[in-house]
């Protein structure tokens, strides 16, 4: 049973957050079928917000982890001097590489986060529906170390729903998701667009887990629950090594 998947009802790397709630199975199954027929990208929905966060930081050299086919890269290209984009999926990265072939400001690398240039630091690092594919605590620690002094980390992530609060918080999304599908993709389809076919993963960490890990590894990080089963995290590194965060 699925309430939504990242490559279906609203693509972006985040499959079900409530599993096994069979009492609502019939309704959720119908919603899922409808969403699959009218797909739209949650990632694209949040991309303007991400770009705004990066632009506000004044970042010039940007790292996009898990770039997919490059929709966010295209937006970042308008505000950054250089964009380095990592994507581990071979089929997806080919699309991105072809898209930006000949653009000296964009570097597309077929690699996951572990395959980045470990000697390099960036003004801004972005993960859009990617963090839940990675081990939470060590990844946050490494992300912090990827930033130059004063650099900014921007995350739009997925969390595992747990308890009544999460379930109630997700009710508006369950209603809004099919409405957005009809607005953004009114024509019924049988196959997903290419930018919504990247591999998915189930979120393992709850929002409480994420808040606790961020408090430990990214002191001062700002975390907010968002619509469509998402949260956002913004962290500004200290301007000087060993100093306090700019948050």
What are these regions (language model features)?
Residues 65:
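Conserved beta-strand/loop positions that form the S-adenosyl-L-methionine
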Residues 134-143:
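A short, conserved alpha-helix within the catalytic core of class I
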Residues 69-71, 75-106, 110-115:
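Class I SAM-dependent methyltransferase SAM/SAH-binding core
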């Amino acid at each position: 049973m699925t309430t939504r998947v990242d490559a279906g009802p609203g693509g972006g790397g985040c499959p079900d957050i409530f599993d096994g709630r069979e009492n609502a199975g019939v309704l959720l199954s119908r919603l899922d079928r409808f969403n699959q027929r009218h797909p739209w990208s949650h990632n694209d929905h949040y991309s303007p917000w991400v770009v705004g966060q990066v632009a506000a930081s004044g970042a010039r050299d940007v790292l996009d982890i898990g770039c997919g086919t490059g929709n966010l890269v295209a937006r970042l290209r308008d505000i950054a001097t250089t964009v380095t984009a990592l994507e581990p999926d071979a089929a997806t990265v080919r699309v991105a590489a072809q898209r930006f072939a000949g653009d000296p400001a964009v570097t597309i690398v077929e690699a996951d986060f572990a395959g980045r240039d470990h000697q390099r630091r960036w003004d801004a690092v972005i993960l859009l529906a990617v963090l839940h594919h990675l081990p939470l605590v060590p990844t946050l620690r490494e992300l912090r170390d990827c930033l130059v002094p004063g650099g900014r980390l921007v995350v739009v992530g997925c969390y595992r729903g747990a308890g009544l609060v999460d379930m109630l918080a997700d009710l508006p999304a369950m209603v809004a998701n099919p409405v957005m599908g009809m607005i953004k993709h009114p024509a019924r389809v049988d196959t997903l667009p290419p930018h919504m076919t990247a591999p998915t993963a189930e979120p393992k960490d709850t929002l409480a887990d994420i808040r606790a890990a961020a408090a430990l590894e990214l002191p001062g990080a700002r975390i907010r629950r968002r619509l469509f089963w998402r949260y956002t995290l913004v962290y500004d590194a200290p301007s000087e090594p060993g100093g306090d965060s700019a948050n």
